[in-house]
């Protein structure tokens, strides 16, 4: 069963403390931009997988291999474990998926959606925590707000 509002609201934790310095953010951006990009897809709600839907998502993505940025993954895991300990208390927490680096060009977007096991490697899906990190300085672009679904959406 998928939690519905308002139950799922208790599952949201937010930090305003930076995980990365501006220099570390730039290193992640540089790595993400250097990797092979693919047109981002969406789950499409079918068991056979995902597809491209330009009405839901227009962006490119790449996957940052664990071995190529171990310090980044260490910092992400530290933050994830702290959030889990402070808010959720899940057992057996570990990073199981590489970080998805998403690049939005002007006019790019990702409409309302629910995160899941985007790599499709875990059956049944085991993602317990989903994280979003803003790497770009928000004064350098318009839009891009991360919004959570509210009643009626």
Segment roles from a protein language model:
Residues 1-153:
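Fe(II)/2-oxoglutarate oxygenase catalytic core
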């Amino acid at each position: 069963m998928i939690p519905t509002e308002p139950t799922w609201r208790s599952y949201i934790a937010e930090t305003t403390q930076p995980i990365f310095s501006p220099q570390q953010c730039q290193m992640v951006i540089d790595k993400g931009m250097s990797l092979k990009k693919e047109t981002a897809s969406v789950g499409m709600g079918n068991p056979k997988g995902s597809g491209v839907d330009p009405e839901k998502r227009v962006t490119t993505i790449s996957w940052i291999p664990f071995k190529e940025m171990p310090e980044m993954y260490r910092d992400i895991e530290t933050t994830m474990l702290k959030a889990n300990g402070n808010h959720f208390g899940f057992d057996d927490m570990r990073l199981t998926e590489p970080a998805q680096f998403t690049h939005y060009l002007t006019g790019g977007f990702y409409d309302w959606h629910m995160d899941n096991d985007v790599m499709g490697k875990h059956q049944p899906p085991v993602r317990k925590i989903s994280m979003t990190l803003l790497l770009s300085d928000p004064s350098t672009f318009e839009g891009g707000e991360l919004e959570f679904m509210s009643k009626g959406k």
